[in-house]
UniProtKB/Swiss-Prot annotation:
This is Exodeoxyribonuclease 7 large subunit. It catalyses: Exonucleolytic cleavage in either 5'- to 3'- or 3'- to 5'-direction to yield nucleoside 5'-phosphates. Its EC number is 3.1.11.6. Keywords: Cytoplasm, Exonuclease, Hydrolase, Nuclease. Gene3D superfamilies: 2.40.50.1010. It is an enzyme of class 3 (hydrolase). The gene is xseA. It comes from Leptospira interrogans serogroup Icterohaemorrhagiae serovar copenhageni (strain Fiocruz L1-130).
């Protein structure tokens, strides 16, 4: 035997508890098996064991967790899967599975499909808070989409009438459970959206039920109908679960049809009190406005314009006449100035024309002089120009040779000549 100090039972139990509580593998786990030793205490806690072919584990389903369970009743021999954490019961020295959620086998696959649909619709913005429509404070007509025979319709009508007897109620009956339920719910919502009915708010839902009973309100068509409704929708499905997609798509959701009616319909006495307060505020505002206008009228009545209106009008008329005379005089001065400028421009034009005429005569005279001095004019008077065969102008006989062929340029043309003699 070793010399180490022996541990007490409590110490060993505490070590085991710490090991269990510190293990991530034993927290938030799913366990499947068959129910045995099922019992429910007066406190509401449920105790049972889960077993398979080789082992058994004790489970505790506390009241605060099992009150949200809406599935079929639990009983011995039923196959389920549970979600929870392993804990150690120190007094008994036994470990236990503290259950927070129970699902029937096969339900987990459905939940996975619902979660995928939820993510898909969330990406599309179906659940966006900014798209939620405001629930009217004082609806005149309430539309109800639910089963015409269930307790939900009775609760909604009873509460609505008790709160506001004058409320108009329009019922669009529909199937709320089974394969035909989704299409029936969609048709009811679309009918209540028809403009002829003038519905202000819709309550859509049903009383409580099992997980399978509520599946219609997780259907994609129903969720889209909620989101696409022109009229605000309050979701009212009893025993609300955390996977009911229609609740997320609705403009507001409540845990029961009764709560939906209480939220949608104001109490008549509250409405009357509001109207009374509103009437008081309107009267107070009118009194203040009238008093303010009376003071303003009194102030204006003391002004000159209201005391001697004709005198003020005569002054304004005289002022207009003075302005008219000034305008007429200014216009006359403008016209005279323009007339003087026009005459000045006309005289200037005449002077320019005379100058141009004299300039033209001088130009013609000098042109004639220049033409008289040109070679062509000189040759017309009998002169000629003599060139050698290279085109050089001959100015004296010494510049030519005997028998040299020369060109004579006359006024009428040219001719060839030959020099004779020395």
């Amino acid at each position: 035997m070793e010399d180490s100090k022996p541990l007490s039972v409590s110490e060993v139990t505490r070590i085991i508890k710490n090991l269990i509580s510190g293990s991530k593998d034993l927290k938030n786990i799913w366990v499947r098996g068959e129910i045995s030793n099922y019992s429910k205490a007066s406190s509401g806690h449920i105790y049972f064991s889960l077993k398979d072919a080789g082992s058994l584990i004790r489970c505790t389903f506390f009241n605060y967790s099992n009150k949200n369970y809406s599935g079929k009743p639990l009983s011995d021999g039923k196959e389920i899967q549970v979600y929870g954490t392993i804990t150690l019961y120190e007094a008994g020295g036994s470990y236990n599975l503290n259950v927070t959620r129970v699902e029937e086998l096969g339900q987990g696959d459905i939940l996975l499909q619902i979660e995928k649909l939820k993510q898909k619709l969330a990406v599309e913005g179906i659940f966006d808070p900014e798209k939620k429509r405001r629930i009217p404070s004082f609806p005149k007509t309430l539309g109800i989409a639910t089963s015409p025979t269930g307790a939900a319709i009775e609760d909604i009508i009873k509460i609505s009438r008790s709160r506001f007897p004058g409320i108009n109620i329009l019922i669009a009956p529909c199937i709320v459970q089974g394969e035909d339920a989704p299409d029936s719910i969609v048709a009811a919502i679309e009918e209540l959206n028809h403009p002829n009915w003038k519905v202000d708010v819709i309550i859509a839902g049903r009383g409580g039920g099992s997980f399978e009973d509520l599946m219609a309100f997780n259907d994609e068509k129903v969720v889209r109908a909620y989101a696409n409704s022109r009229i605000p929708i309050i979701s009212a499905v009893g025993h609300q679960t955390d996977v009911l997609l229609s609740d997320f798509a609705a403009d507001h959701f409540t845990p029961t049809p009764t709560a939906a009616a209480e939220y949608a319909i104001p109490k008549e006495e509250d409405v009357l009190q509001f109207l009374s307060q509103l009437e008081g505020r309107i009267k107070s505002s009118l009194v203040t406005k009238i008093s303010s206008n009376r003071d303003r009228l009194r102030l204006l009545s003391g002004k000159f314009i209201f005391k001697e209106p004709m005198q003020l009008l005569n002054q304004r008329s005289q002022r207009v006449d003075e302005i008219g005379i000034r305008l007429q005089k200014a216009l006359s001065n403008k016209l005279n100035l323009a007339r003087v400028r026009l005459e000045r421009y006309q005289n200037l034009t005449s002077r320019i024309q005379n100058i141009l005429f004299h300039k033209k005569q001088k130009a013609e005279f000098w042109t004639s002089k220049v033409e008289d001095l040109s070679p062509a004019a000189t040759m017309k008077r009998g002169y000629s120009i003599l060139r050698n065969e290279n085109g050089k102008i001959i100015r004296s006989p010494e510049e030519t040779k005997p028998e040299e062929e020369l060109q004579v340029l006359l006024s009428g043309g040219t001719m060839q000549v030959i020099r004779k003699g020395k």
